[in-house]
């Protein structure tokens, strides 16, 4: 009995002196060194994806490539998203802890890429898919997330909780977000993080702020119907072009007199089509465009104002209006959780001193489907600067000349890793 007691005591001492898996703190130095060791991998992934962009709903080869790289890294639960080409993967440490979502978008744009960048310099490589490009940086987003996954997998014995990696298709067309939300709504997330490369932010800087960081979006799409006829007898027709132009003029007046001007909403009319030849009055005209806003209610009210003006002015011209099904407020502003933003700003500034900013001038009027993830959990979205005039990476997103400074990708990876690993230890 005495010998058994000694053995039991020694066993208890041994267990007490053994580090508990998942409790090790990852130092900033270790994190930065790890990111550096994967620099070649990050660039390789980004360049492959840049060569072969695919648009929303058709990212077949992109998804195949991403899943192949995940299988090379290790074992994950991989789930396809029903009704979508998107998917998500889970890394479960099987230890108690928080559940963190990390997201990337995966689609490209139907734009022919220019071999010349924003400063007139030749790009080192361009898309091999003619007519398509990663002109918004989604290739970089995927490279950031894959590298982050690789490092988290390497560190899995040091971590607690669960990571869910979200590969969202069709961000540009808003087609992938709702199927993704439906597919993951059963998961209890503690936080969801995403980032976006930004050509308006200096390379090597990470923009972090609480509140609205990217704009909400409403689509404009309507037809004005009159009665066509021969151009020589306009009195025998009802010309919808006059009605349509008066609608736009009246909207411009109402914009200043019937809206709360303290809440900025930008109005972009981008399409005006009517008629096919010079001597025929058309039956209809088409107007299209977009609204962008940082206040959801202001955006909705502005959309309703346009509909009212269009209906009333068309009626005054004996015309009618038909609004497109897509003419709705589709995406809310991206709103960062204050607690997460404060935490991230402090921890990422500690990782990259002098490389974080909260300057309001970097607010981006583009829209992001990431906004909808706040239906599931508190969210944080950061902008990673890629603007480098010396390299020529200054062109705006969605342009043929768009390019990125690949050196900036390390900051995106570091910020994502710092958030993901530190956030698991946040007290509730």
Describe the predicted segments one by one:
Residues 24-26, 245-428:
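Metal-dependent amide/peptide-bond hydrolase catalytic core
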Residues 49, 89, 102, 138, ...:
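Divalent metal-coordination and catalytic microenvironments
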Residues 1-8:
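Bacterial N-terminal signal peptides that target proteins for export
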Residues 24-134, 139-160:
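Acidic/His- and Gly-rich active-site-bordering loop/insert found
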Residues 109, 123-133, 139-140, 152-282:
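Histidine/acidic-residue-rich, glycine-tolerant segments that coordinate divalent metal ions
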